[in-house]
């Protein structure tokens, strides 16, 4: 038998029984080592198996394992005779060369000239055979590489065992290693899920191809029936015409029978010719269609071969990547071992130092207790002296009242009082605490009560006598340098209701002319008569005070009445950001986080936890007046950096908000107090590590406008369905992004490209949006802004960031989220597409056309005043309007309202709390031809449709919300476009709605 099987040509020379004897002798090995799904395609192509046989072998429930399927395959091939055996051996040559060599004793070299002749040796067969041989070579290489990797892996396992023997004490590192293993397993499960999804997609694709083939066969049968019907119609018309002509000729030529017979024969010949021509046309069309299908199937096979090669390359690349990750993990493991040993040595040293520090701490506690006892005794003595001072001040007030009464009676009173004042000055300026006098329009709060006056006079008298003393002696700790004024401010901020209205504190800082050793400062009390005179003078003029300095000390600037617990501090803010440091943002507010000791801000008792509400800086022209309550950290820092002189800060104590912000910063939950959402109007590539790659119309969540102190923003991509933060990274701030936008537009202009995105083309690069600089927005930084509006009144809200209104390009746009519960209305761009699809969508459940209502002049005026008119019904005529009531009635019925309105009506719908779904169908000349019938029904041509589509697509950039686009190659006919539109509407209904204008 071995001698007969030396040459491949001898196989075909053997008879059927000898061939099947060879196969049956090795049947056990064949059944165990062969996969039937690999052989059936070749056997079916060799025409020894049919499609039903293949499905029975692969999918029959009678065969529970692969061996039973192979056995049934051999039985079927044995029924085919010699051709079945030869085809089976040739399939073994391709897919199981070792089994082929075992059965025949020949080498499995593939020679295209030695095929058995069961198949046509066409180019397709040669291509498939070459592809199979190349795949076998690649498989052999991969197996060899796998063996090398297995040996290498075994060596690494031995080294890892040695490393684990040296690392028995490092249990913490083992925990980290197990955690990494769990992460790898989760990633592996994710990969398996992705593979399952890919398999499902391939199954769906195969089902779609099968449905397509069924539809094509149905179309062919219908075409054949159509041709047959046409042929019968022509035959019937010819028969009727022939009968008519024969009848007429019989009447005219009844006597002449021979010419009539010749005419009848001629008509029969013409009828036969027409019938033969008709059948030839039908056969020609059928052959052309079958040829096209054969070409398409050939192209699909070639594409599948290319995809398999790409998957093999991707698998090799992924294997290399996993190998590199393993090497990096081992290297990191060794580095961690070394670091752990170093940390152990450092811990032993630190423990020794901590023991020494504990001893020193105990000694310091003992010394502190002794000092506190001495300080407590001295404070008790000071309290007694302070009570004595209060008694003496009352006597001074009584004596001063008597002195003024005597001065009024005596003619030389003013001169004596002036002399007395000169004696009391002692050569230095007084530090006076004066009462805040309200402007004339707040007459109810113009004066303090007598109790409040006495309280503030007592505090200032104590402050003027002894700066280093403490006003409250309950604390055993010694007072600070400016404890008097600080405690006055603390009492005011902690108990704002103790006064009749919020006080305005003002202090003039003194230079080095004041002697530190001299602590006696002069003070004056304002009695009721003087206050009455002051009130009268203020009512006469709100800008100047007519009371002389020698008589009554009053405020140089009237106190302004501020609602809520807000205090206005006036001080010298030279280089304000060097005196204080701020944190926060537009979500939490701007807080003072650091105060430089000895600065003017420290003298004014500003402390961490104080929230800055407003800043007023007069020296700039125009003056700087801004509210910092809703500004970002970048804006607040830019505004405070411009302050360099005398300024007014409106502050309030917000300990709870500051504490929450500090806790979040320490826990690294946030990096600042900023939080807002933006829509990106340009595409930005990833420039470096940590930078975020964005596309046009992406939604980002900005969480820090001064990330790590740099001029960049920290942002996250936003999940369109749940609003959860996803990929983090940094993006340029507003000014840098605006420069990139201008550079991108200039580059596009120099290249003479059209700014409009071509249909079905690449990702959109730029969205041209112009905004008014006068609009309030937390996006623009104070560096980019102009001067602030100085024409605002003090009581008016200072919200305008720009001195004059002009338009500028916006790289980012502020957006706000909405979650509508009811079905949203639907708009189509172009509108002609909506009119074409409207009738078919109305036939489906959940869609209905919103019709225009007829309104009289009175009804229109009433509805328009309420803001319930959306747009006039253009297709119907005058007095027909699309109203809010019509849209809401459909939304309440859980129905999508199909609107035929312009894009400028989107803002009107947003003001009504309606957020339409905008479906943009990209069109070109090819897609216009697909909609030709619908356009003709609407009385529009393809050129007009394309022109209108370009105009409406240009208006999409001005729409204050996102929209869904359908590419031209995503649909082939009107039915597929309808299904794509339904899927897009369902997907948009699930998403969060982002609008640029707050609703």
UniProtKB/Swiss-Prot annotation:
Keywords: Apoptosis, Coiled coil, Cytoplasm, Phosphoprotein. One of its GO terms (cellular component) is cytoplasm. Residues 572-655 form the PDZ domain. Residues 409-565 are annotated as: Maintains the protein in an inactive state. GO terms for molecular function: CARD domain binding. It comes from the Eukaryota. The modification Phosphoserine is found at residue 541. PANTHER family: CASPASE RECRUITMENT DOMAIN FAMILY, CASPASE RECRUITMENT DOMAIN-CONTAINING PROTEIN 14. This is Caspase recruitment domain-containing protein 14. It comes from Mus musculus. The lineage of its organism: Eukaryota, Metazoa, Chordata, Craniata, Vertebrata.
């Amino acid at each position: 038998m071995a001698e007969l099987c030396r040459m491949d040509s001898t196989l075909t020379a053997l008879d059927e029984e000898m061939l099947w004897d060879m196969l049956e002798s090795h049947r056990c090995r064949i059944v165990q080592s062969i996969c039937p799904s690999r052989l059936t395609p070749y056997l079916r192509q060799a025409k020894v198996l049919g499609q039903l046989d293949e499905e029975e072998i692969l999918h029959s429930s009678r065969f529970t394992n692969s061996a039973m399927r192979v056995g049934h395959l051999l039985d079927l091939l044995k029924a085919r005779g010699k051709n079945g055996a030869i085809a089976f051996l040739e399939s073994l040559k391709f897919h199981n060369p070792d089994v082929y060599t075992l059965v025949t004793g020949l080498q499995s070299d593939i020679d295209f000239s030695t095929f058995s002749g069961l198949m046509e040796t066409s180019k397709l067969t040669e291509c498939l055979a070459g592809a199979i041989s190349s795949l076998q070579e690649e498989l052999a290489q991969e197996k060899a590489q796998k063996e090398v990797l297995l040996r290498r892996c075994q060596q690494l396992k031995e080294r890892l065992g040695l490393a684990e023997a040296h690392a028995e004490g490092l249990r913490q590192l083992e925990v980290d290693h197990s955690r990494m293993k769990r992460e790898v397993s989760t990633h592996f499960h994710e990969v398996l899920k992705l593979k399952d999804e890919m398999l499902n997609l391939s199954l769906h694709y195969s089902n779609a191809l099968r449905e397509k083939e069924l539809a094509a066969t149905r179309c062919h049968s219908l075409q054949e029936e159509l041709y047959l019907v046409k042929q019968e119609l022509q035959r019937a018309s010819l028969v009727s015409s022939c009968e008519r002509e024969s009848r007429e000729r019989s009447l005219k030529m009844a006597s002449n029978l021979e010419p009539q017979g010749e005419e009848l024969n001629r008509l029969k010949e013409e009828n036969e010719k027409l019938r033969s021509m008709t059948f030839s046309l039908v056969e020609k069309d059928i052959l052309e269609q079958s040829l096209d299908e054969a070409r398409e199937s050939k192209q699909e096979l070639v594409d599948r071969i290319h995809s398999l090669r790409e998957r093999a390359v991707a698998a090799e690349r992924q294997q290399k990547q996993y190998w590199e990750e393993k090497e990096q993990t081992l290297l990191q493991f060794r580095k961690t071992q070394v670091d752990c040993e170093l940390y152990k040595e450092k811990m032993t040293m630190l423990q020794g130092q901590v023991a020494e520090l504990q001893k020193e701490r105990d000694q310091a506690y003992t010394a502190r207790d002794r000092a506190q006892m001495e300080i407590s005794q001295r404070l008790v003595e000071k309290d007694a002296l302070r009570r004595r001072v209060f008694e003496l001040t009352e006597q001074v007030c009584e004596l001063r009242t008597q002195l003024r009464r005597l001065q009024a009676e005596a003619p030389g009173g003013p001169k004596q009082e002036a002399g007395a004042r000169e004696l009391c000055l002692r050569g230095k300026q007084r530090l006076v605490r004066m009462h805040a006098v309200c402007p004339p329009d707040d007459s109810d709060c113009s004066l303090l009560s007598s109790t409040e006056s006495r309280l503030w006079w007592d505090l200032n008298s104590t402050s003027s006598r002894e700066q280093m003393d403490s006003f409250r002696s309950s604390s055993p700790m010694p007072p600070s340098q400016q404890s008097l004024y600080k405690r006055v401010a603390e009492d005011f901020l902690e108990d704002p209701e103790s006064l009749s209205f919020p006080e305005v504190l003002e202090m003039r800082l003194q230079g080095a002319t004041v002697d530190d050793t001299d602590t006696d400062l002069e003070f004056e009390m304002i009695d009721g008569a003087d206050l009455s005179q002051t009130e009268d003078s203020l009512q006469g003029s709100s800008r100047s005070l007519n009371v002389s300095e020698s008589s009554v000390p009053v405020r140089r600037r009237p106190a302004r009445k501020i609602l809520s617990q807000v205090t206005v501090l006036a001080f010298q803010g030279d280089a304000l950001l060097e005196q204080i440091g701020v944190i926060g943002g537009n979500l939490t507010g701007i807080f003072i986080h650091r105060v430089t000791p000895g600065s003017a801000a420290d003298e004014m008792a500003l402390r961490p936890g104080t929230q800055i509400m407003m800043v007023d800086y007069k020296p700039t022209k125009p003056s700087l007046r801004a509210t910092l309550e809703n500004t970002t950290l970048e804006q607040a820092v830019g505004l405070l950096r411009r302050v360099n002189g005398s300024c007014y800060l409106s502050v309030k104590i917000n300990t709870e908000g500051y504490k929450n912000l500090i806790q979040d910063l320490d826990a690294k939950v946030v990096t600042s107090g900023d939080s807002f959402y933006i829509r990106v109007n340009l595409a930005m590539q990833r420039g470096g590590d940590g930078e975020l790659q964005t596309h046009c119309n992406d939604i980002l969540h900005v969480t820090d406008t001064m990330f790590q102190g740099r001029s960049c923003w920290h942002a996250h991509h936003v999940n369109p369905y749940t609003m959860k933060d996803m990929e983090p990274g940094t993006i340029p701030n507003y000014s840098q992004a605006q420069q990139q936008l201008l550079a991108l537009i200039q580059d596009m202009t120099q290249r003479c490209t059209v700014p409009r995105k071509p249909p079905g083309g690449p990702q959109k690069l730029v969205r041209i949006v112009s905004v008014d600089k006068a609009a309030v927005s937390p996006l623009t930084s104070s560096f980019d802004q102009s001067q602030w509006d100085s024409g605002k009144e003090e009581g008016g809200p200072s919200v305008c960031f720009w001195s004059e209104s002009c338009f500028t390009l916006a790289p980012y746009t502020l957006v706000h989220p909405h979650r509508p519960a009811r079905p949203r209305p639907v708009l189509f761009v172009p509108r002609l597409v909506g009119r074409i699809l409207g009738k078919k969508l109305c036939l489906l459940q959940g869609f209905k056309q919103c019709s225009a209502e007829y309104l009289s002049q009175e009804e229109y005026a009433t509805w328009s005043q309420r803001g319930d008119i959306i747009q006039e019904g253009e297709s119907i005529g005058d007095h027909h309007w699309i109203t809010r009531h019509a849209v809401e009635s459909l939304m309440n019925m859980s129905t999508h309202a199909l609107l035929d309105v312009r894009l400028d009506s989107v803002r009107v719908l947003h003001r009504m709390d309606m957020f339409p779904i905008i479906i943009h169908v990209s069109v070109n000349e090819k897609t216009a031809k697909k909609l030709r019938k619908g356009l003709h029904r609407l009385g529009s041509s393809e050129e007009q449709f394309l022109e209108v589509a370009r105009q409406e697509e240009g208006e999409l950039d001005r729409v204050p919300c996102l929209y869904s686009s359908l590419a031209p190659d995503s649909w082939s006919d009107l039915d597929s476009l309808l299904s794509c539109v339904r899927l897009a509407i369902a997907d948009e209904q699930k998403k969060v709605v982002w609008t640029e204008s707050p609703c």
